[in-house]
Amino acid sequence: GFVEARRYIAHDAAPRYLSLYSTKTFEVLDSPAYRAALANQTPWSKANIARFQNMIRSVARITISRGRGRGAALGLVRLRGATPDLRDRLASRFDPELHDGVIGISLLEGDPSLSRSLTNPSDDSGAGDWFILIEGTSIDAVASLTPSHFSGVLNDATVVSSGTYRLMFDLAAADL
């Protein structure tokens, strides 16, 4: 069910690496096959997951997506305490054409029931967090929108973190 995988390295962010995966449908991530794969990790997967530090795992729906393409740089703003009305307020700020070098802005809303940590399942403090992704041609372009550009509409939502990443690679479905 996976159709794309992207890997980033931090420019000015934590954690050091960021991986984004896309699926044909959101339901793939709640399917018996996916749950079985998570429950029966290979020895290689277990060894690699054990090395993860400062890991954030979020299974999220893309609820707003404006613009086209993938950028060489990514701005990321992580929000906690978001409410459904925030989605509409944020949408009014998601216009990549107004910002030089920004080619896309998306909102990803974490699903608390599917976003449990693989390394510490009892820690679900950020399972329902939302993420604003800003795709751009340069670090400077995406940094101009993180997070002050959105501060006037956040209300009670808290910015947990923000930062910038550089794209390392992008794999399409045929590559996976």
Protein language model features and the residues they cover:
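Short, well-ordered beta-strand segments in beta-rich or mixed alpha/beta enzyme
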Residues: 9-35, 69-80, 87, 115-146
